[in-house]
Amino acid sequence: MRFKGLDLNLLVALDALMTERKLTAAARSINLSQPAMSAAIGRLRAYFNDELFLMQQRRLVPTPRAEALAPAVREALLHIQLSVIAWDPLVPAESDRRFRIVLSDFMTLVFFEKVIKRVAREAPGVSFELLHVNDDPDERLRSGDLDFLILPDQFMSATHPSAKLFEDKLVCVGCPSNQQLRGKLSLKRFMSMGHVAAMFGRTLKPSIEQWLLLEHGFKRRVEIVVPGFNSIPMLLQGTNRIATLPLLLVRHFEPTIPLQIVDHPLPPLSFTEALQWPLLHNSDPGNIWMRNIILEEASRIETSSERCSQEPRATQSW
């Protein structure tokens, strides 16, 4: 089928090439032979009057022209899929769908493992690809590259639907031998101490505790930066450094890693974890099914989170 001289099938080929970056893998993903995909590249080059892809170390590297075309092509194909082609109904017990989800290591540990266990019972063929928080999750939502984001609601995009999961609060933690955490932690002492902090992506995007501190006008002395939360408790051992962590994560590590826990010197720093999905997937039966499971499991965590948040917090050590 042609539209203004362009064979629309070539757009499917272009999208596959941008996704896979290898000729054989791209051909396989859309059920073409390798010679047919090579021919498609030739026709694309002729139509757009550009090389589009260059071979470097056995990978196809897109030209600036291809990079510029890719988002519009992906969005057009998604609109066709979602608006013209009917979604297949999801039968959980028979589905082999794979969900791609961006979330922190903290949320994987304290929450999403519950979702995985439930899905394993109800839909054993369903699988997951859990991805690190990166520099531009909004672009990945827009392109349809992701099924879900799970992040604090401060980091949610205004252009895609979202729902709240549960609330948590931040506490300060350190090694049990850290004498500077004895007694009530003052803001002055908090600011004078060395900190371990999680930051994400190539641009070191701040995590929720850094974001909240900056909102209050404070900038800590961060001495160690790590790409996630889960390694922080071990990095505090045998040092006088401190960290600011979600209470749910601290509770998770209590049985295995000795920590001294104190209230944060600022007013209660609470935050809400939220779920977001692409607007284009809003009516997708599979997305709706997974969305409901995630929200149901979150509702079970909320009660325990609220109970933790209401406990009186004196200095404690384990």
UniProtKB/Swiss-Prot annotation:
Keywords: Activator, DNA-binding, Nodulation, Plasmid, Repressor, Transcription, Transcription regulation. Residues 6-63 form the HTH lysR-type domain. InterPro entries: LysR-type_TF, LysR_subst-bd, NodD_PBP2, Tscrpt_reg_HTH_LysR, WH-like_DNA-bd_sf, WH_DNA-bd_sf. Residues 23-42 bind DNA. Pfam families: HTH_1, LysR_substrate. One of its GO terms (molecular function) is DNA-binding transcription factor activity. Belongs to the LysR transcriptional regulatory family. NodD regulates the expression of the nodABCFE genes which encode other nodulation proteins. NodD is also a negative regulator of its own expression. Binds flavonoids as inducers. This is Nodulation protein D. It comes from Rhizobium leguminosarum bv. trifolii. The gene is nodD.
